[in-house]
Amino acid sequence: MTVKVYEIIDKVYKLIGRPIDNIDTLLQNCDEKVWDIYANALTTTINQSDSDFGKQTLKRYKPTSLGEMSAWVAAIRPGFASLLNTFLDRQSYSTGVEALDDILKDSFHFMIYQESIMKYLVWLGIEEKGTYDIIKKIAKKKFKQEELDALQKQLEEGWVKNVKTIDGFAETWQVVQDAAHYSFNASHSLSVAIDSIYGAYLKSHYPLEYYTVVLTLYAGDMERTSKLISELPYFNIELKPIKFGKSGADYSMDTESNCIYKGISSVKYCNSQIADELLELSKNKYDNFIDLLKDIKENTSLNSRQLMILTGLNFFSDFGNNQYLLNVIDVYDRFASAKIIAKNKMESLGLTDYLMTKYAAKETKSQWREIDNNGLIKELCGRLSNDSMDIVSQVKFDMEYLEYTTYTNDKMADYYWIVIDFVTHKDPCRPTVILRNIHSGEEIKTRIKQPKVFRENPFGCFSILRIDGFTYEFKKKPVNGKWVSTDETEPVLVEYEVYK
């Protein structure tokens, strides 16, 4: 992800139409909207903040300044794990030695940065010029055991000299050994934090431009795309599906309607070449789908799978509903190039003597010849009903080729939900699921806590459930080896009816 950090910043500023702000200007523009990006974990594609772990920690820590952001960048390194919860929850922390706390004031009394460790070593009598080499040798495990023992003894002597007791030394020495393996220097943490803040500023103040850029850059990353799309409602941005005559290869924005049109190249098995070809065809006028289909077959590189995918995703919705159009394609493929139709195949092809008399110029004992293909196709398609895919089929189709769905149906009552993700762990009767409300499109991640509930009413991915409400319980987190309740709640599925 980090390799694209500058590319994101550069492309968003270009789309906005202004040069990249210098750091002073950026920090002056950091208002509450910027810090809310972190507090609400709206950080997909933002430097250092993109992972699920990063998001969880930011929701707890809620940084509000460059200094705090820099400290967070350093604190989430593995070597700081033993003190991370204390840091994230902003609990008061002390080394237990006032003089050492004063030295570590800039890092909130923690030994977060390499410079923090260097200050600690100097305080205990090590010459400053040798401190960095010590950190490197610890990190790379270059110390022989006798050398490490000698260093520890020297530091213990310095501790006793300053503190007048050995108490507390072992804890700080362990922190040093842990942190040395992974800690950042302060300048590196600061630069990473600044890169992150650029992203948060652009996302909070220019969300339409930001999401247009990153959705295009990550078009092939379905997991990240899904996470980006889940953030759009916060900014009241609507993601419009791919549409003939509107969509090109990349995502594009419409500032008047505050919406983003999906790019064709972001769809599974599709590419920029067919996007360009279809956009060129859209400049023509087509009275019906059959005429367009003929041009697609003759003048583009679309293969049958790509055509099926785009049709199922309602790309050609101006010409009818998707199941109807898929049926039209089936009719077209069967009869567009038919020169001769055997009479013994008529029933399996859904043809009658009436149709063949009307659309074949010649008849033999066993065949119909010189077929008016276009006339036959149009009459057969005229008998098709303008159907859409059913709910389950459409959601399955979306998840297969988009890896997300935007399907809603306002004719369905608001207590119907469809399962779009289903994961089991050790106990197959305690699944974790993502549910999508068919009426509103709201998505909720929930789980079944009691196996008996699931055994009595089993379901799977793409099942439709009637749910009249959820039970909310406090989440738990590990603290000092024990699970304790937090003030954050999560929905638990206790009662439901399997509708389909």
Q: Residues of each region from the PLM?
A:
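Noncatalytic, beta-rich nucleic-acid-contacting surfaces in large DNA/RNA-processing enzymes
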Residues: 1-500
